[in-house]
Amino acid sequence: MMPRLSTTTWIVGLLLISGCYSPLMRWQSPESDNVALLAEEDNEEGVELVGDTTIPLGLDYRKIEGVSLVNGLNGTGGDSGPSSLRSSLISEMQSYDVRNPQQLLQSPTVSLVVVRGWLPPGVEKGDSFDVEVVVPPKSKTTSLRQGYLLKGRMREIRVLDNAVHSGHVAGLAQGPVIVDSIFGGTDDEVLETRGRILGGGQSQLTRPLGLGIRGNSTVRHAAAIGAAINSRFHKTDRNGQSGVARPKRDNYIELAVHPRYKNNIHRYVRVVRSIALKESPGERVLRTESLERRLLEPTASARAALQLEAIGEDAAHILLKGLESSSPEVRFYSAEALAYLDREEAAKTLGWAAANISAFRWYALTALATMDHVAAYEALNELLHVPSAETRYGAFRALRSRNAADPLVRGESLGGGFAFHVISSEAAPMIHVSKSQRPEIVLFGQHQKVVPPAFLFAGKEIMIKGTEDGRLRLIRFTTGDQEDPQETCDAEVDPMIRAIVRLGGGYCEVVQALREARQGGYLDAKVVVNAMARPNRTYHGDDASEATSPDEPPIRVANPVPELFVDRLETDGETADTMPRYEPEEVSETPAEDSDTSSFMGRMRNWFAK
């Protein structure tokens, strides 16, 4: 093993050469966290692995930022005053041939905003990502509600020698702004000036993964590592089949993402680094025998499963033995590895793990999503009927990841503004609202009833009331002498949402109506925001509620956390291994006559109650 000082110096140099470092060169960056994690994978079999001579590169998240303009505000915008941000925006506007930018920025219908997002490892040009928009301090803007972000450029910003430097354009951002107060169900002034554009960013670059080779490497050594990797992994494109590893220099190998691991890049890198560089048939037999013993030992099962997965189909028979173990951990790690080999035997165990053990749920859903076999589809379908909100929604998202055109999860676009899905479910009715990847509402359970309300609001212009015959009447208030448009529908969630859209409402208006209906006691279905599987959970044994003693600490899942469900704007670019714990929000029922006078909706409720 190399001395710590020389290894660290080598890593710094290689990161600088390859350009794979965080904006502020923090040693606690996401990439350095993963380097430390990967370095802990000791090799007990004596065979040299790819990971023994390489370090992964490109596993960090790139923060990109910019300044842009939100327009379409209903008198809630305003000038931000003189600042470097304002000067930058004026320069951007002039590059788009906008006339009189100074005058435009003073309009109450527009607002300067700071835009930011995160480019994940392995991102390709054209991929979408979520974007956050924030009104800067001292701005006169009071709300971004109903605003639309005009196309803005985003760059990586770095501080070098006490000076701010920006790179080339790394992303573009554009789309309707969803203010954070929509998800919080409040008129909070701060949340009104902060929001997000779901899937509104578009990457303008491709970030390849890579392996840096330790020590004084040669072209021949790099080629040998590439050949070992390509003997296990290859991809198919319009030019035919090719290996995923491409030696670029004597100390650097570029690594393409294998399609099976597109939602779990960190696992992919760990499997690649678990490939044997050179191994005779006799050595392979001895190593697999050793790995079988380790697989059946719960404390060593996770790493053994990775090495067996790296061997490939030739090791599947050993992983199948793991499915018969009495240990839930051994069964899970064996099934997870088998899933990435697309073995149907994995599906049943993974479905059980997702439904019953929260610490394994995140990984099990991602593994099922990667499988092509119909057994995985059936397992995910069954999970749509379990009580857990995060399991049901996680199964839905996994099914969409497998095949977005599947009639079960295809849904429809309402008003061109958000995706709408109605899923048959035998569990209690639930409505899920997304705040990541795309505007999306999913009804779990058909014909969900709405108790005709005295009144509730969908935005500030649409009111919903019950009729004498038990239906719903929706009215959109307009200015002037023209008659207010109205819609009448059955007292169910599905037709109510469609009526809101017909009256010109969008995602924000629908989400507000659902919140008010739930809080007012007009909905039996629970309304949940961002119910996704969570990291940082621990497995306590067969009884997850059983407290463990200091001598028997809970077991944290050893596998790298996949990205299929991560809300990156909530994590501030941290790796999912280190991100803080947060739970999905469930909208609770509160009395409809709540006399809150601090918000617009509270004042309206009190007015109608008189």
Give residue spans per PLM region.
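Structural detector for internal amphipathic alpha-helices that build alpha-solenoid repeat scaffolds
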Residues: 301-311, 321-322, 331-343, 351-352, ...
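Predominant activation on well-ordered alpha-helical scaffold segments within soluble catalytic domains
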Residues: 90, 226, 230, 266-269, ...
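Bacterial N-terminal signal peptides that target proteins for export
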Residues: 1-10
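Amphipathic alpha-helical scaffolding segments comprising HEAT/armadillo-like alpha-solenoid repeats
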Residues: 281-293, 313-324, 343-354, 373-385, ...
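Beta-strand/loop-dominated core regions that host nucleotide or nucleotide-derived cofactor-binding catalytic loops
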Residues: 21-60, 65, 71-300, 311, ...
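Core subunits and conserved enzymes of cellular information-processing
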Residues: 325-328, 355-356, 385-395, 508-512
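C-terminal motif of bacterial Sec signal peptides marking the signal peptidase cleavage site
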Residues: 17-19
